[in-house]
Amino acid sequence: MADADVIVVGAGLAGLVAACELVERGHSVIIVDQENAANIGGQAFWSFGGLFFVNSPEQRRLGIRDSQELALQDWLGTAGFDRPEDHWPREWAHAYVDFAAGEKRSWLRARGLQTFPLVGWAERGGYDALGHGNSVPRFHITWGTGPALVEIFARRIRDSVRVRFAHRHRVDELIVNAGLVAGVRGSILEPSNAPRGVASSRKVVGDFEFRASAVIVASGGIGGNLELVRKNWPARLGRVPDQLISGVPAHVDGRMIGIAESAGAHVINNDRMWHYTEGITNYDPVWPNHGIRILPGPSSLWLDANGDRLPVPLYPGYDTLGTLEHICRSGQDYTWFILNARIIAKEFALSGQEQNPDLTSRNVRDLLSRVKPGAPAPVQAFVDHGVDFVSATSLRDLVAGMNDLPDVVPLDYAKVAAEVTARDREVANRFTKDGQITAIRAARNYLGDRFTRVVAPHRLTDPKAGPLIAVKLHILTRKTLGGLETDLDSRVLKEDGTTFGGLYAAGEAAGFGGGGVHGYRSLEGTFLGGCIFSGRAAGRGAAADIA
């Protein structure tokens, strides 16, 4: 006898969206998750709430001309699909861009979404028109950040009589009868009162079995499992980093992807991952090895561990994967930003809802305080307390402080000074051969960047802009770009291309759709949207198939 119509494995954003779609169509759902109720929303709760919209009213009000055609050009140029198994990821890419240019915004707003009026410009590229990057700003921030986005869906099912949450239930096996998935088996973990994101006990106190007509895997990726990240590290990126910090909680362990694969599901593109190169150690950690990502403006001077400037166009915020590959091939696991107080005040944001309390709490008064002189309070807290930050009034003292940090290659002051001096000479007038200075000036053509995000070019060593600041940047794990292969209804496929009856996948476990809708790279603002779009498809697909 079935325990519910559908079992959803994972209480993150994709799972919540899928459950909402099922409940709206009259189906009963069990949501199984290995963590406690405090972790509903998963990684999405911790996020900045960035969403990729195309030709939105917010864009148009800021003078941004966007279109479905331009967005698809950017997506395909960024994804770089080049494998036979990219058939469904490519289909998902076309469908997702259509969604982002079509009903995505209105569909979310009908459910309560509000967005911040300024649009961010992430992954700017710096190559040609058919290459990687966003041609225009498309990063829309949820008013209320990740928690507000999660709540849009959580509140729709929290008290529903059709939904049962089975927390602290860890799935260990898919039940397969006559080639069809018919449920899940697993272990009941001991109760936990651990706060959200804190690693919880894995002590088993019992077992369970749930049966249903369909199972949706929405369990997330591998970003919290550093062993699995290293195992899947592709040779094309160079050596596997020795030093990694974690951008997601420990429960993001990738177990369900392997469990589904063992049952017969096809996993593709597991060598494609999205890890950030601007990670800093959290001075107030929540989970093990907790790192935070800097969302940088384009003005910081970026040096490798040996003091050499990163090549064109590896500027802050331009090409995450290209920068990651360059770092890994440099022989070291970290890099440096050199900047000053003027730059950090305007150009440093920190990813995550807890690092943006004004946006998260939707406090307009606190938000307006960002226009005051000085860095935002969360950023200043890292300057004051972060182990990766150095401040000094002279470049010589700054380099000495950088060399005092643990686990660094000693920098030669003359080499660093030569890079800084050469860069500073290029801002003396409105002409330059320096690509980064040209990029900064181009960014300031966008009203949102000019007033809130990008400082006017000036000398790093200008005493009026000081003190000087250096930041040691680590590689920060985050997203799994490959995963369970699915069709456009989120049905999981077998290796021979046929559907695996009764099994669906959504969110990061499915590579955000199809087993890798992003290809090799992301345009940003696409992960939450990918969870929403694929979760919606999974809920609708399962509902249609069991009707």
UniProtKB/Swiss-Prot annotation:
It is an enzyme of class 1 (oxidoreductase). InterPro entries: FAD-dep_OxRdtase_2_FAD-bd (IPR003953), FAD/NAD-bd_sf (IPR036188), KsdD_DH (IPR014614), Succ_DH/fumarate_Rdtase_cat_sf (IPR027477). Its cofactor is FAD. Pfam families: FAD_binding_2 (PF00890). Its EC number is 1.3.99.-. PANTHER family: 3-KETOSTEROID-DELTA-1-DEHYDROGENASE, KSDD-LIKE STEROID DEHYDROGENASE RV0785. The low activity could be due to different substrate specificity. This is KsdD-like steroid dehydrogenase MSMEG_5835.
